[in-house]
Amino acid sequence: MVRKFDFLVIGSGIAGMSFALKVAHKGTVALICKAGLEEANTYFAQGGIASVTNLAVDNFDKHIEDTMIAGDWISDRAAVEKVVRNAPGQISELIKWGVNFDKKDNGEFDLHKEGGHSEFRILHHKDNTGAEIQESLIEAVKQHPNITVFTNFFAVEIITQHHLGIIVTRYTPGIKCYGAYVLNENTGEVDTFLSKVTIMATGGCEAVYRNTTNPLVATGDGIAMVYRAKGAVKDMEFIQSHPTALYHPGDRPCFLITEAMRGYGGVLRTMDGKEFMQKYDPRLSLAPRDIVARAIDNEMKQRGDEHVYLDVTHKDPEETKKHFPNIYKKCLSIGIDITKDYIPVAPAAHYLCGGIKVDLDGQSSIRRLYAIGECSCTGLHGGNRLASNSLIEAVVYADAAAKHALSVLERYDFNEDIPEWNDEGTISNEERVLITQSMKEVNQIMESYVGIVRSNTRLTRAWNRLDILYEETEKLFKSSKATRELCELRNMINVGYLITRQAMERKESRGLHYTIDYPHPQK
Protein backbone atom coordinates (compact mmCIF):
# COMPACT_ATOMS: atom_id res chain seq x y z
CA MET A 1 0.00 0.00 0.00
CA VAL A 2 1.24 3.51 -0.86
CA ARG A 3 0.46 6.39 1.51
CA LYS A 4 1.32 10.05 0.92
CA PHE A 5 1.88 12.76 3.52
CA ASP A 6 3.59 16.15 3.39
CA PHE A 7 5.51 15.29 6.56
CA LEU A 8 6.56 11.82 7.67
CA VAL A 9 7.58 11.83 11.35
CA ILE A 10 9.20 8.60 12.54
CA GLY A 11 9.07 8.50 16.35
CA SER A 12 6.59 9.69 18.94
CA GLY A 13 8.61 11.20 21.80
CA ILE A 14 8.91 14.88 22.73
CA ALA A 15 10.89 15.64 19.52
CA GLY A 16 8.59 13.92 17.03
CA MET A 17 5.33 15.11 18.57
CA SER A 18 6.57 18.69 19.03
CA PHE A 19 7.59 18.82 15.37
CA ALA A 20 4.24 17.37 14.26
CA LEU A 21 2.32 19.98 16.26
CA LYS A 22 4.45 22.81 14.87
CA VAL A 23 3.91 21.93 11.17
CA ALA A 24 0.42 20.39 11.09
CA HIS A 25 -1.30 23.71 10.32
CA LYS A 26 0.52 23.75 6.96
CA GLY A 27 0.21 20.16 5.76
CA THR A 28 -0.65 16.53 6.44
CA VAL A 29 1.47 14.68 8.99
CA ALA A 30 2.00 10.93 9.46
CA LEU A 31 3.29 10.14 12.95
CA ILE A 32 4.79 6.63 12.97
CA CYS A 33 5.35 4.80 16.25
CA LYS A 34 6.64 1.27 16.50
CA ALA A 35 4.57 0.54 19.61
CA GLY A 36 2.02 2.77 21.37
CA LEU A 37 2.31 6.55 21.78
CA GLU A 38 3.48 6.12 25.38
CA GLU A 39 6.39 3.84 24.45
CA ALA A 40 8.94 6.63 24.08
CA ASN A 41 12.03 7.50 26.10
CA THR A 42 10.44 10.84 26.97
CA TYR A 43 7.89 9.02 29.11
CA PHE A 44 10.66 7.64 31.34
CA ALA A 45 12.56 10.92 31.88
CA GLN A 46 12.21 11.63 35.58
CA GLY A 47 14.45 14.57 36.41
CA GLY A 48 13.26 17.54 34.42
CA ILE A 49 14.01 20.07 31.71
CA ALA A 50 16.73 22.72 31.96
CA SER A 51 16.02 26.37 31.21
CA VAL A 52 17.18 29.69 32.64
CA THR A 53 14.09 31.13 34.34
CA ASN A 54 15.22 32.75 37.60
CA LEU A 55 17.06 35.78 36.22
CA ALA A 56 17.75 37.13 39.73
CA VAL A 57 20.56 34.57 40.11
CA ASP A 58 20.86 32.74 36.76
CA ASN A 59 21.68 33.77 33.19
CA PHE A 60 22.32 32.28 29.74
CA ASP A 61 26.11 32.57 30.06
CA LYS A 62 26.12 30.36 33.18
CA HIS A 63 24.02 27.67 31.47
CA ILE A 64 26.26 27.84 28.38
CA GLU A 65 29.41 27.51 30.52
CA ASP A 66 27.98 24.57 32.51
CA THR A 67 27.11 22.79 29.24
CA MET A 68 30.57 23.38 27.74
CA ILE A 69 32.31 22.11 30.90
CA ALA A 70 30.14 18.97 31.03
CA GLY A 71 30.80 18.34 27.31
CA ASP A 72 34.56 18.37 27.98
CA TRP A 73 34.94 21.42 25.72
CA ILE A 74 34.10 19.59 22.47
CA SER A 75 30.48 20.75 22.32
CA ASP A 76 29.55 22.89 19.32
CA ARG A 77 29.25 26.34 20.91
CA ALA A 78 26.74 27.55 18.30
CA ALA A 79 24.45 24.60 19.15
CA VAL A 80 24.87 25.25 22.89
CA GLU A 81 23.97 28.93 22.52
CA LYS A 82 21.00 28.07 20.30
CA VAL A 83 19.50 25.65 22.83
CA VAL A 84 20.16 27.78 25.93
CA ARG A 85 18.87 31.05 24.44
CA ASN A 86 15.78 29.45 22.87
CA ALA A 87 14.88 27.36 25.92
CA PRO A 88 12.57 29.82 27.75
CA GLY A 89 10.41 30.31 24.63
CA GLN A 90 10.01 26.55 24.20
CA ILE A 91 9.09 26.12 27.88
CA SER A 92 6.25 28.60 27.26
CA GLU A 93 5.17 26.51 24.26
CA LEU A 94 5.09 23.31 26.37
CA ILE A 95 2.97 25.07 28.99
CA LYS A 96 0.61 26.22 26.20
CA TRP A 97 0.25 22.54 25.18
CA GLY A 98 -0.84 21.68 28.71
CA VAL A 99 2.36 20.72 30.56
CA ASN A 100 2.19 21.51 34.28
CA PHE A 101 5.54 22.27 35.92
CA ASP A 102 5.62 22.31 39.73
CA LYS A 103 5.40 25.73 41.37
CA LYS A 104 6.03 27.04 44.88
CA ASP A 105 3.34 28.64 47.04
CA ASN A 106 4.38 32.08 45.74
CA GLY A 107 3.66 31.02 42.13
CA GLU A 108 7.30 30.80 41.03
CA PHE A 109 8.65 27.61 39.43
CA ASP A 110 9.98 25.07 41.94
CA LEU A 111 13.43 24.64 40.41
CA HIS A 112 15.76 21.70 41.06
CA LYS A 113 19.55 21.71 40.81
CA GLU A 114 21.32 18.69 39.30
CA GLY A 115 24.91 17.52 38.89
CA GLY A 116 27.03 19.90 36.81
CA HIS A 117 24.57 22.84 37.03
CA SER A 118 25.82 25.96 38.85
CA GLU A 119 22.28 27.19 39.61
CA PHE A 120 18.76 25.91 40.29
CA ARG A 121 17.26 25.78 36.76
CA ILE A 122 15.54 22.40 36.34
CA LEU A 123 11.78 22.66 35.81
CA HIS A 124 10.00 19.46 36.78
CA HIS A 125 6.67 17.80 37.49
CA LYS A 126 7.24 15.85 40.73
CA ASP A 127 9.66 13.04 39.75
CA ASN A 128 7.96 12.09 36.48
CA THR A 129 8.47 15.12 34.24
CA GLY A 130 8.78 13.06 31.07
CA ALA A 131 5.42 11.34 31.60
CA GLU A 132 3.74 14.72 32.19
CA ILE A 133 5.18 16.11 28.94
CA GLN A 134 4.41 12.96 26.93
CA GLU A 135 0.79 12.80 28.12
CA SER A 136 0.21 16.50 27.38
CA LEU A 137 1.66 16.16 23.86
CA ILE A 138 -0.35 12.99 23.17
CA GLU A 139 -3.56 14.89 23.98
CA ALA A 140 -2.57 17.78 21.70
CA VAL A 141 -1.61 15.40 18.85
CA LYS A 142 -4.85 13.41 19.12
CA GLN A 143 -6.90 16.59 18.84
CA HIS A 144 -5.17 17.86 15.68
CA PRO A 145 -7.13 16.99 12.51
CA ASN A 146 -4.04 17.06 10.25
CA ILE A 147 -2.01 14.51 12.24
CA THR A 148 -2.59 10.80 11.57
CA VAL A 149 -1.03 8.49 14.16
CA PHE A 150 0.11 5.01 13.05
CA THR A 151 0.72 2.74 16.05
CA ASN A 152 2.52 -0.59 15.67
CA PHE A 153 4.12 0.61 12.43
CA PHE A 154 7.87 -0.01 12.20
CA ALA A 155 10.11 1.91 9.77
CA VAL A 156 12.36 -0.59 7.97
CA GLU A 157 14.35 1.64 5.58
CA ILE A 158 14.32 5.24 4.40
CA ILE A 159 13.80 5.60 0.64
CA THR A 160 16.56 7.26 -1.44
CA GLN A 161 17.83 7.19 -5.06
CA HIS A 162 19.22 3.76 -4.19
CA HIS A 163 15.68 2.38 -4.48
CA LEU A 164 15.48 3.77 -8.04
CA GLY A 165 18.47 1.63 -9.04
CA ILE A 166 21.06 4.42 -8.70
CA ILE A 167 24.34 3.51 -6.98
CA VAL A 168 24.69 5.54 -3.76
CA THR A 169 27.92 5.63 -1.71
CA ARG A 170 29.12 7.70 1.28
CA TYR A 171 30.67 10.09 -1.26
CA THR A 172 27.54 10.54 -3.40
CA PRO A 173 26.54 14.24 -3.32
CA GLY A 174 22.89 15.19 -3.01
CA ILE A 175 21.38 11.99 -1.59
CA LYS A 176 17.65 12.65 -1.15
CA CYS A 177 15.04 11.04 1.09
CA TYR A 178 11.60 10.39 -0.46
CA GLY A 179 9.93 8.70 2.52
CA ALA A 180 10.24 5.26 4.11
CA TYR A 181 9.27 1.62 3.80
CA VAL A 182 7.25 0.88 6.93
CA LEU A 183 6.18 -2.51 8.31
CA ASN A 184 2.50 -2.51 9.26
CA GLU A 185 2.56 -4.98 12.15
CA ASN A 186 -1.22 -5.20 12.07
CA THR A 187 -1.12 -6.79 8.57
CA GLY A 188 2.48 -8.03 8.31
CA GLU A 189 2.89 -6.06 5.05
CA VAL A 190 5.50 -3.39 4.29
CA ASP A 191 3.78 -0.15 3.19
CA THR A 192 5.37 2.65 1.17
CA PHE A 193 5.12 6.06 2.86
CA LEU A 194 5.97 8.86 0.41
CA SER A 195 6.67 12.30 1.86
CA LYS A 196 7.95 15.71 0.90
CA VAL A 197 9.93 15.90 4.14
CA THR A 198 10.93 13.09 6.54
CA ILE A 199 11.82 13.59 10.21
CA MET A 200 13.79 11.02 12.16
CA ALA A 201 12.86 11.22 15.85
CA THR A 202 13.46 7.62 16.87
CA GLY A 203 15.28 8.19 20.16
CA GLY A 204 18.35 6.42 21.45
CA CYS A 205 19.97 3.02 21.20
CA GLU A 206 20.69 2.00 24.79
CA ALA A 207 18.79 -1.29 24.44
CA VAL A 208 21.97 -2.56 22.76
CA TYR A 209 23.30 -2.80 26.35
CA ARG A 210 22.17 -5.41 28.87
CA ASN A 211 21.76 -2.86 31.69
CA THR A 212 19.76 0.14 30.51
CA THR A 213 17.25 2.61 31.90
CA ASN A 214 15.67 2.93 28.45
CA PRO A 215 12.55 1.14 27.27
CA LEU A 216 13.48 -1.87 25.18
CA VAL A 217 12.23 -0.13 22.01
CA ALA A 218 15.44 1.99 22.08
CA THR A 219 17.24 -0.10 19.48
CA GLY A 220 18.78 2.75 17.46
CA ASP A 221 16.46 2.24 14.47
CA GLY A 222 16.73 5.75 13.01
CA ILE A 223 20.50 5.93 13.33
CA ALA A 224 20.91 2.51 11.69
CA MET A 225 18.53 3.40 8.82
CA VAL A 226 20.34 6.66 8.09
CA TYR A 227 23.76 4.98 8.30
CA ARG A 228 22.64 2.28 5.83
CA ALA A 229 21.34 5.05 3.54
CA LYS A 230 24.90 6.52 3.60
CA GLY A 231 24.07 9.45 5.91
CA ALA A 232 26.62 10.95 8.33
CA VAL A 233 26.67 9.63 11.92
CA LYS A 234 28.86 11.19 14.61
CA ASP A 235 30.09 10.86 18.24
CA MET A 236 28.59 7.40 18.81
CA GLU A 237 31.32 6.54 21.32
CA PHE A 238 29.77 8.92 23.86
CA ILE A 239 27.24 6.71 25.65
CA GLN A 240 26.14 8.18 28.95
CA SER A 241 25.52 5.75 31.75
CA HIS A 242 23.13 6.86 34.44
CA PRO A 243 25.20 6.34 37.58
CA THR A 244 22.26 5.42 39.78
CA ALA A 245 19.84 2.86 38.33
CA LEU A 246 18.03 0.79 40.94
CA TYR A 247 19.85 -2.51 41.37
CA HIS A 248 17.19 -5.20 41.24
CA PRO A 249 18.31 -8.26 39.25
CA GLY A 250 15.86 -9.20 36.51
CA ASP A 251 14.54 -5.68 35.90
CA ARG A 252 14.99 -4.65 32.24
CA PRO A 253 14.80 -1.75 31.74
CA CYS A 254 16.38 -0.77 35.04
CA PHE A 255 14.37 1.66 37.17
CA LEU A 256 16.03 5.08 37.16
CA ILE A 257 16.87 6.83 40.44
CA THR A 258 16.92 10.44 39.30
CA GLU A 259 19.95 12.74 39.47
CA ALA A 260 17.74 15.10 41.48
CA MET A 261 18.01 12.73 44.44
CA ARG A 262 21.72 13.52 44.71
CA GLY A 263 20.94 17.21 44.25
CA TYR A 264 18.49 16.83 47.14
CA GLY A 265 21.32 15.62 49.39
CA GLY A 266 21.66 11.90 48.65
CA VAL A 267 25.03 10.40 49.61
CA LEU A 268 26.75 7.53 47.78
CA ARG A 269 28.16 4.76 49.99
CA THR A 270 29.93 1.42 49.48
CA MET A 271 28.17 -1.78 50.52
CA ASP A 272 29.75 -1.49 53.98
CA GLY A 273 28.32 2.02 54.39
CA LYS A 274 31.42 4.14 53.70
CA GLU A 275 31.30 7.35 51.65
CA PHE A 276 33.67 7.23 48.67
CA MET A 277 33.11 10.18 46.31
CA GLN A 278 35.71 12.31 48.17
CA LYS A 279 38.35 10.07 46.53
CA TYR A 280 37.21 11.09 43.05
CA ASP A 281 35.90 14.66 42.95
CA PRO A 282 35.57 17.67 45.30
CA ARG A 283 31.90 18.01 44.28
CA LEU A 284 31.30 14.60 45.90
CA SER A 285 27.93 13.07 44.94
CA LEU A 286 27.08 16.17 42.85
CA ALA A 287 29.90 15.64 40.34
CA PRO A 288 28.84 15.18 36.68
CA ARG A 289 27.47 11.80 35.65
CA ASP A 290 30.55 10.42 33.90
CA ILE A 291 32.73 10.98 36.97
CA VAL A 292 30.13 9.47 39.30
CA ALA A 293 29.48 6.49 36.99
CA ARG A 294 33.22 5.75 36.65
CA ALA A 295 33.69 6.11 40.41
CA ILE A 296 30.87 3.64 41.12
CA ASP A 297 32.15 1.27 38.41
CA ASN A 298 35.64 1.42 39.94
CA GLU A 299 34.41 0.79 43.51
CA MET A 300 32.31 -2.16 42.34
CA LYS A 301 35.16 -3.70 40.31
CA GLN A 302 37.76 -3.19 43.07
CA ARG A 303 35.56 -4.69 45.74
CA GLY A 304 33.80 -7.31 43.61
CA ASP A 305 30.42 -5.82 44.54
CA GLU A 306 27.27 -5.83 42.39
CA HIS A 307 26.15 -2.35 43.48
CA VAL A 308 26.70 0.60 45.82
CA TYR A 309 24.15 2.49 47.94
CA LEU A 310 22.46 5.88 47.71
CA ASP A 311 21.50 7.20 51.14
CA VAL A 312 18.73 9.75 51.82
CA THR A 313 17.87 8.45 55.32
CA HIS A 314 19.22 11.67 56.90
CA LYS A 315 16.62 13.80 55.07
CA ASP A 316 13.12 14.61 56.34
CA PRO A 317 10.96 11.51 55.52
CA GLU A 318 7.85 13.48 54.52
CA GLU A 319 9.91 15.79 52.31
CA THR A 320 11.51 12.76 50.60
CA LYS A 321 8.12 11.14 49.93
CA LYS A 322 6.75 14.42 48.57
CA HIS A 323 9.69 15.04 46.20
CA PHE A 324 10.14 11.46 45.01
CA PRO A 325 6.75 9.70 45.20
CA ASN A 326 7.41 7.25 42.35
CA ILE A 327 10.85 6.25 43.61
CA TYR A 328 9.45 5.80 47.13
CA LYS A 329 6.62 3.62 45.78
CA LYS A 330 8.86 1.51 43.49
CA CYS A 331 11.44 0.84 46.22
CA LEU A 332 8.70 0.01 48.74
CA SER A 333 7.35 -2.58 46.27
CA ILE A 334 10.66 -4.49 46.55
CA GLY A 335 10.93 -4.10 50.32
CA ILE A 336 13.06 -0.94 50.55
CA ASP A 337 11.79 2.08 52.54
CA ILE A 338 14.04 4.88 51.26
CA THR A 339 13.34 7.02 54.35
CA LYS A 340 14.97 4.28 56.50
CA ASP A 341 16.98 2.06 54.12
CA TYR A 342 19.83 2.68 51.70
CA ILE A 343 18.92 2.32 48.00
CA PRO A 344 21.03 -0.23 46.03
CA VAL A 345 22.20 1.40 42.78
CA ALA A 346 24.51 0.61 39.83
CA PRO A 347 25.28 2.36 36.51
CA ALA A 348 23.15 1.58 33.42
CA ALA A 349 23.30 2.82 29.81
CA HIS A 350 21.06 5.87 29.72
CA TYR A 351 21.65 8.37 26.91
CA LEU A 352 23.43 8.65 23.56
CA CYS A 353 25.23 11.97 23.03
CA GLY A 354 26.02 11.23 19.38
CA GLY A 355 23.79 10.16 16.51
CA ILE A 356 22.75 11.38 13.06
CA LYS A 357 24.86 14.45 12.31
CA VAL A 358 22.69 17.57 11.83
CA ASP A 359 23.17 21.30 11.33
CA LEU A 360 21.57 24.15 13.31
CA ASP A 361 18.27 23.59 11.46
CA GLY A 362 18.21 19.87 12.29
CA GLN A 363 19.05 18.92 8.67
CA SER A 364 20.96 15.68 8.18
CA SER A 365 23.53 15.11 5.41
CA ILE A 366 20.67 13.57 3.36
CA ARG A 367 18.41 16.18 1.74
CA ARG A 368 14.75 16.34 2.79
CA LEU A 369 15.65 14.39 5.96
CA TYR A 370 15.84 15.98 9.41
CA ALA A 371 16.85 14.32 12.67
CA ILE A 372 15.81 15.62 16.09
CA GLY A 373 15.92 14.44 19.68
CA GLU A 374 18.22 11.73 20.97
CA CYS A 375 18.81 10.06 17.57
CA SER A 376 20.47 13.27 16.33
CA CYS A 377 23.91 14.71 17.03
CA THR A 378 23.54 18.49 17.20
CA GLY A 379 26.87 19.02 18.96
CA LEU A 380 25.13 20.29 22.12
CA HIS A 381 26.38 17.51 24.37
CA GLY A 382 29.95 17.15 23.10
CA GLY A 383 31.66 14.45 25.15
CA ASN A 384 28.99 14.31 27.85
CA ARG A 385 25.44 15.55 28.34
CA LEU A 386 24.64 17.97 31.15
CA ALA A 387 21.70 16.64 33.19
CA SER A 388 18.24 17.68 31.89
CA ASN A 389 19.61 19.26 28.69
CA SER A 390 18.12 16.55 26.46
CA LEU A 391 14.40 17.33 26.65
CA ILE A 392 15.05 21.01 25.99
CA GLU A 393 17.35 20.17 23.04
CA ALA A 394 14.54 18.05 21.56
CA VAL A 395 11.98 20.90 21.59
CA VAL A 396 14.41 23.62 20.49
CA TYR A 397 15.56 21.57 17.48
CA ALA A 398 12.00 20.41 16.72
CA ASP A 399 11.16 24.11 16.47
CA ALA A 400 14.19 24.88 14.26
CA ALA A 401 13.51 21.90 11.97
CA ALA A 402 9.81 22.81 11.72
CA LYS A 403 10.60 26.40 10.71
CA HIS A 404 13.14 25.26 8.11
CA ALA A 405 10.95 22.47 6.71
CA LEU A 406 7.99 24.86 6.34
CA SER A 407 10.19 27.38 4.50
CA VAL A 408 11.25 24.81 1.85
CA LEU A 409 8.16 22.56 1.66
CA GLU A 410 6.80 24.02 -1.58
CA ARG A 411 10.05 23.18 -3.41
CA TYR A 412 9.40 19.45 -2.97
CA ASP A 413 6.91 16.99 -4.39
CA PHE A 414 6.25 13.26 -4.01
CA ASN A 415 8.47 10.96 -6.05
CA GLU A 416 5.92 8.75 -7.81
CA ASP A 417 8.59 6.46 -9.34
CA ILE A 418 9.44 4.72 -6.06
CA PRO A 419 8.79 0.96 -6.33
CA GLU A 420 6.83 -0.82 -3.63
CA TRP A 421 8.64 -3.13 -1.18
CA ASN A 422 9.58 -6.42 -2.84
CA ASP A 423 9.70 -9.50 -0.63
CA GLU A 424 9.22 -12.11 -3.34
CA GLY A 425 11.11 -15.31 -2.66
CA THR A 426 11.32 -14.70 1.09
CA ILE A 427 9.78 -16.97 3.71
CA SER A 428 8.24 -16.40 7.12
CA ASN A 429 10.90 -17.26 9.65
CA GLU A 430 9.61 -19.45 12.45
CA GLU A 431 13.00 -19.69 14.15
CA ARG A 432 12.57 -16.78 16.58
CA VAL A 433 15.21 -18.30 18.85
CA LEU A 434 17.84 -17.27 16.26
CA ILE A 435 16.82 -13.63 16.71
CA THR A 436 16.35 -13.58 20.50
CA GLN A 437 19.65 -15.37 21.09
CA SER A 438 21.51 -12.96 18.79
CA MET A 439 19.96 -10.00 20.64
CA LYS A 440 21.23 -11.40 23.95
CA GLU A 441 24.68 -11.78 22.38
CA VAL A 442 24.68 -8.11 21.25
CA ASN A 443 23.69 -7.05 24.79
CA GLN A 444 26.44 -9.16 26.33
CA ILE A 445 29.12 -7.96 23.87
CA MET A 446 28.29 -4.28 24.39
CA GLU A 447 28.00 -4.57 28.19
CA SER A 448 31.28 -6.48 28.59
CA TYR A 449 33.52 -4.84 25.99
CA VAL A 450 32.10 -1.40 25.09
CA GLY A 451 30.95 -0.25 28.54
CA ILE A 452 32.04 2.52 30.93
CA VAL A 453 35.75 1.54 30.83
CA ARG A 454 37.19 0.40 27.48
CA SER A 455 40.45 -0.90 26.00
CA ASN A 456 41.79 -1.70 22.53
CA THR A 457 41.60 -5.42 23.32
CA ARG A 458 37.98 -5.25 24.47
CA LEU A 459 36.92 -3.12 21.49
CA THR A 460 38.65 -5.43 19.00
CA ARG A 461 36.91 -8.42 20.53
CA ALA A 462 33.53 -6.62 20.31
CA TRP A 463 34.22 -5.76 16.64
CA ASN A 464 35.03 -9.38 15.76
CA ARG A 465 31.98 -10.78 17.57
CA LEU A 466 29.63 -8.20 16.02
CA ASP A 467 31.02 -8.97 12.55
CA ILE A 468 29.96 -12.63 12.86
CA LEU A 469 26.47 -11.60 14.03
CA TYR A 470 26.22 -9.08 11.17
CA GLU A 471 26.93 -11.72 8.49
CA GLU A 472 24.43 -14.17 10.03
CA THR A 473 21.70 -11.54 10.39
CA GLU A 474 22.05 -10.05 6.88
CA LYS A 475 21.71 -13.54 5.43
CA LEU A 476 18.58 -14.11 7.53
CA PHE A 477 17.12 -10.69 6.57
CA LYS A 478 17.55 -11.32 2.83
CA SER A 479 15.79 -14.69 2.97
CA SER A 480 12.98 -13.84 5.46
CA LYS A 481 9.86 -11.70 5.49
CA ALA A 482 10.48 -8.52 7.49
CA THR A 483 9.47 -8.68 11.15
CA ARG A 484 9.97 -6.07 13.83
CA GLU A 485 12.28 -8.34 15.86
CA LEU A 486 14.51 -9.13 12.88
CA CYS A 487 14.72 -5.45 11.87
CA GLU A 488 15.52 -4.44 15.46
CA LEU A 489 18.31 -7.01 15.67
CA ARG A 490 19.76 -5.72 12.39
CA ASN A 491 19.63 -2.15 13.72
CA MET A 492 21.20 -3.13 17.06
CA ILE A 493 24.14 -4.76 15.27
CA ASN A 494 24.63 -1.69 13.02
CA VAL A 495 24.56 0.64 16.03
CA GLY A 496 26.82 -1.60 18.12
CA TYR A 497 29.30 -1.54 15.24
CA LEU A 498 29.14 2.29 15.03
CA ILE A 499 29.70 2.72 18.79
CA THR A 500 32.62 0.28 18.69
CA ARG A 501 34.22 1.72 15.54
CA GLN A 502 34.00 5.34 16.68
CA ALA A 503 35.33 4.34 20.12
CA MET A 504 38.32 2.68 18.39
CA GLU A 505 38.93 5.82 16.33
CA ARG A 506 39.13 8.11 19.39
CA LYS A 507 42.71 7.70 20.63
CA GLU A 508 42.16 9.54 23.93
CA SER A 509 39.93 9.52 26.99
CA ARG A 510 37.43 12.36 26.85
CA GLY A 511 34.00 12.91 28.32
CA LEU A 512 32.12 9.61 28.46
CA HIS A 513 34.73 7.72 26.45
CA TYR A 514 37.32 6.30 28.82
CA THR A 515 39.97 3.85 27.61
CA ILE A 516 42.80 2.42 29.69
CA ASP A 517 45.09 2.49 26.61
CA TYR A 518 44.78 6.29 26.24
CA PRO A 519 43.83 7.46 29.76
CA HIS A 520 44.28 11.21 29.08
CA PRO A 521 42.65 13.68 26.70
CA GLN A 522 44.69 14.87 23.72
CA LYS A 523 45.83 18.45 23.93
Feature annotation, model-predicted:
Residues K96-E189, L194, A201, A245-H248:
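Conserved redox-cofactor binding core of oxidoreductases
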Residues F7-L31:
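N-terminal Rossmann-like FAD-binding beta1-loop-alpha1 element of flavoenzymes
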